[in-house]
Amino acid sequence: MLIKFINSFLDKKSPMIVHAHCDGPCGVYDPASTRVAAEAVLSMTKKLIALEAPSSTDSAEWATYSNTFSRYVAVKEEQAKETKKEILILWTDYFKPVHLETYPDLHETIWKAAKLCSACKVNIDLAQAEELMSYEEKIHNIFWASKGRSDALVKAS
């Protein structure tokens, strides 16, 4: 009898709508983490391009160079992966079909940004890193416009 009562009560309740980027209904989304990671990719790409190999055969100089180069590459790849993860969270968890009506190029923009993240992981290419920042800014602008706000993208570097 009690089960029937509970079931009849539950049947009359409309389902709760939740919005979340995680497995909890927090509803907290912000493209700031995407910008920080993408900006780190650009910064590390610039550092890698500027890094000069030693002109001598001194093993200590080469060890220092190799260590610095390896660290820069590791950070660049890690941040490209983080950028992609954050972009995909916005795409799969925040953006809804209604956003596609207003921003019909959203899927293409996200797809290109994700592809650029992969390209930036495997290449040391300033043009690709700058293009990634450009796409991150597009996503930033779409995100805030979808919330009825116009927040300027402020770079840390």
Give each language-model segment a name:
Residues 1-72, 104-138, 142-157:
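N-terminal intrinsically disordered, cationic/polar leader segments
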